Amino acid sequence: MNIFAKQQINNPLSHNKKQLSLKPKTNKKSMANKSGSKSAIKSFPKTFWTVIVMEFLERGSYYGVMSVLGVFLILSGAEGGLGFSKEQAGAILGTIPPLLYFLPIMAGAIADRYGYRKVLFFAFTCMILGYGFTGLSNSYAMIFLSLILMAVGAGFFKPVISGTIAKSTNQENSGLGFGIFYWSINLGAFLFPLILVPILKAESYSYIFYMASSIAFVLLLINLFIYREPVREKTNKSLVQVFSEMLLVLKDWRFILMIFLYSGFWILYFQMFGTVLWYVRDYLDMTPLNNAVNSFLSLFVENPSWKFDVEHVTVINAGVIILLQLIVSNIVKKAPALPTMMAGIGLGTLGMIILSFSASPWVFLIGIMTFTLGEMTTHPKYISYIGLIAPADKKALYLGYSFLYGVIGSSIGGFLGARLYVKYVDELGTPSTLWLILSGIGIFSMVALFLYNKFLVRKTN
C-alpha cells in the first residue's frame, strides 16, 4: 500500500524476502531456521518495536482517511459529504500525495540536525491539527489547508521512523526488521479501512478524521514518554546543501528520464484514491459480491449484512500485498530489473484494461487484483534498478531522490484523473473510455522504458 513507505523499504525488504521464503530441505535446517528466526526477533531493541507500533497506527489512520477522502469531498451535504466538484477534489488529490513524497528529503536533513524526537513532536502536532480541522471544516480553502498541514506532518514523520528502523537494526537482522516494518504498513492499510472506517462513517465522515487526529495524539504521547531516540551522527547539513544535492541529481538526464517514464505507472496507481472510488460509487452494483460474502459469513454469524463500499478498494490492495508479496518477490528475485519493471507495468495496465470490460463486480475485483500484482512486481525492482544505475559514489544520494516518481505520478494522476472522469464518465457516460485512456498511459510507460533500455542503457554501459 503504501505509498511513500513502500519506496523507502522495498530495497531492504527484497533482501528479506529471500530469507523468509527459504524452504528447509531437512528437519535440522528447519529447526535451525526457526531458532534463528526466534533469536532474530529477540535481537530487536525496545525502540524498534515502539516505532513499528507507531508506523502501524500512523499508516492505518492515513489510509483509513485516504480510502474515503476522494468520495467524501464530492458527496453532497445531504449524503454526509462536502459537495465539492470532482475537479476541486482532483486538485486536492493532486497536491497532498506529492507533498508526502517530497517533504521527507528536507525532513530527513532537519531530523539529523535537530533530533528525531523534536521532529516527531512537530509532525504529530501537524497531524493532530490537520486531521482535526479537516473533520471540523466545510469550506474548500480550510479543507485544503488542513490537509496540507496533515501532509506536512506525515512527510516529516516518515524519514524519522525509517531512520530509527535503520539505526535500531544491524547487518544480521535488518532484512527481517524492514520486512516487519513493511508488513506493519500494509496491515494498518488493511485493518483500518476494513474495520474502523465503516463503523465511523456510519455516524459521520468527520469521525474518520477525528479518529486519525486522536491517533496522532496517542503517537505524540508515545513520542514523549516511550520513544527513545537512537544514537545518530549529528550533521550540519543545511537545506541549501540538500537542494544543491538535488540539482546535482537533476543534471543526470538519463536518470531523470527513467523516473519520468516510470511515473506513468504511478499515474494509474493514484487513481485508486480518486476515479476508481468514484466509479465504484457511481457505476457498480456490488450486490452479487455482497451476497457471496454474506453467504460465507453466515457460516459463522447470524444474518450478516456486510456491504462492499469504496474503502474496500484500499483493503483489496493491501490484502493482496500481504498475501502475495513474498511469493511474487521470490518469483522475480533473479530476473533483471528493467524488464521486470516493464512486466509489472504491463500487469498494472492489464488491470486497467480489465476495468473497461464491464461494470460487473467480479470483473472489477479481477482488475484491481491484477493491478496490485503489477505494483508488487514492478516497484521493488525499481528500487534495485536505481542502485544499479547510480554512480558508485552517489548510490545513497540517488536512492534518496528516487522519490520523484511519486511526486510526478500523484500530481498528474490527481488533476488528470478528475478531468477525464468528468468528461468521459459524467458527461459522456462511457467509463470504459476512461480506463482505456489511462491504460494508454501505462502502455506508453512500458514501451518507452523498453526503448530506454535498448537505446540508452546499452550505449551508456
Per-segment meaning from a language model:
Residues 156-170, 377-391:
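Intracellular juxtamembrane helix-capping segments at the cytosolic ends
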Residues 1-6, 10-46, 170-175, 196-273, ...:
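Intracellular loop-helix junctions on the cytosolic face of multi-pass helical membrane proteins
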Residues 125-139, 346-359:
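C-terminal ends and interior cores of transmembrane alpha-helices
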Residues 102-138:
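Conserved MFS/SLC helix-loop-helix module at the cytosolic interface between two early adjacent transmembrane helices
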Residues 198-214, 419-443:
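A membrane-interface helix-boundary motif in multi-pass transporters
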Residues 175-200, 215-219, 402-414:
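Glycine-rich segments within core transmembrane alpha-helices of 12-TM secondary carriers
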Residues 91-109, 315-327:
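Central cavity-lining transmembrane alpha-helices of secondary-active solute carriers
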Residues 67-88, 274-308:
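Short amphipathic helix-loop junctions that connect adjacent transmembrane helices
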